């Protein structure tokens, strides 16, 4: 059975590029355009990993990450954060909230796949 990844980003093009790379690597993907939409997908999916943008409307990635870590079915699910900002303060917030990896946009699909393979056990 393929490992399932929730991909959360307000950019349809980022979701498309990342989704294609992940599916080609054998992962199943579920997608959401913002944190609030993604929260609605936590109960119905057994997720192995979550990849979330930081800067999104409605609910940003840090707020979403905090909610994920409080959610009974996903609190132990590793989360990779995507952002255009590489500042230490933002990284510290993400790490404190439970992020396991941080990828700066724009990124090469292989960079994402490398991070995913380190966090998902075969």
Q: What spans do the regions from the language model cover?
A:
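Alpha4 helix (beta4-alpha4-beta5 surface) of REC/receiver domains from two-component response regulators
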Residues: 63, 86-103, 114
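Active-site beta3 strand of CheY-like receiver
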Residues: 45-51
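Receiver (REC) domain active-site loop signature in two-component systems and cognate sites
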Residues: 56
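Short hydrophobic/Thr-rich beta-strand motif most characteristic of the beta2 strand and flanking loop
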Residues: 26-33, 41
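Acidic catalytic/metal-coordinating carboxylates
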Residues: 33-37, 60-66, 86
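Short amphipathic alpha-helix used as the core "switch/output" element in two-component signaling
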Residues: 40, 62-75
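C-terminal output helix
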Residues: 107-116
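Active-site residues of response regulator receiver
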Residues: 53, 83
